[in-house]
């Protein structure tokens, strides 16, 4: 059986990247929450 995690930098960035997060209201909320929490990495 094939493993479920098949890493791809492009797919990772397009799905979870900063620009993608900023496109939607919910994504901006995610970034804001991570900023408020003091995360070192806001997005991938």
UniProtKB/Swiss-Prot annotation:
A biological process term (GO) from this entry: translation
GO molecular function: structural constituent of ribosome
Gene Ontology cellular-component annotations: ribonucleoprotein complex; ribosome
The keyword Transmembrane is assigned to this record: no
Database matches in InterPro entries: Ribosomal_bL34, Ribosomal_bL34_CS
The UniProt record lists the keyword Cell division: no
Keywords: Ribonucleoprotein, Ribosomal protein
Family: Belongs to the bacterial ribosomal protein bL34 family.
HAMAP family associated with the record: Ribosomal_bL34
Record-given protein name: Large ribosomal subunit protein bL34
Lineage of origin: Bacteria, Pseudomonadati, Pseudomonadota, Betaproteobacteria, Burkholderiales
Gene behind the chain: rpmH
């Amino acid at each position: 059986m094939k493993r479920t995690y098949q890493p791809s930098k492009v797919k990772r960035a397009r799905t979870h990247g900063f620009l993608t997060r900023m496109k939607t209201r919910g994504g901006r909320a995610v970034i804001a929450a991570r900023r408020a929490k003091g995360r070192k990495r806001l997005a991938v």
